[in-house]
Amino acid sequence: LSGANQLSANPTLRRTNRIRTIHGSLAIEQNTLTLEQVTAVLNGKQVLAPPKDIAEVKNAYEIYDRLEELDPYSVDDLLTAHGIMTRGLVDEAGMFRSKPVGVVDQEGHVLHFGTLPQYVPDLVMELLNWVKNSDVHMLIRSCVFHYEFELIHPFADGNGRVGRLWHTLLLSKWNPAFAWLPVESIIHDRQEAYY
């Protein structure tokens, strides 16, 4: 982490890591674009790919680029981040979900039911308050946040992407180097253990 100054002084390295971050986070969610295609999209080049996958890349880049502006303890900023991350992709972009949801595996087996929608806003606020006020080290708090956030499953879609973004945000407020470390690509490389 002492290399944070090197990262902040090297825009090429920062951009490369940001692209790896976005590719890793989206690949976890079945986005089909390769690292090279993600790079091409962000360089304004035409890529032959599903429009949804291209939109996910552009949306993710926009919100990761605004990371420094976000307050990690603000429900409004969390909703704004979700709105940008899922803009044009889901009906309830930037809003907590209004219906029950569950996570299913490839065979259709339910792995997890999300919190009932009427409890989501209060649980998210409670979680953010805990992260803000806890004396537990931020490395642990950010992991607990990510785990609990995914259990609550506050959105109809985009929970994983926003959870990983927020995990990075929390860590980057503790140590700015985390804004540029491609943690999401590490998670992607260890995806089975992640779930």
Label the model's feature ranges.
Residues 1-195:
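FIC/Doc superfamily catalytic core
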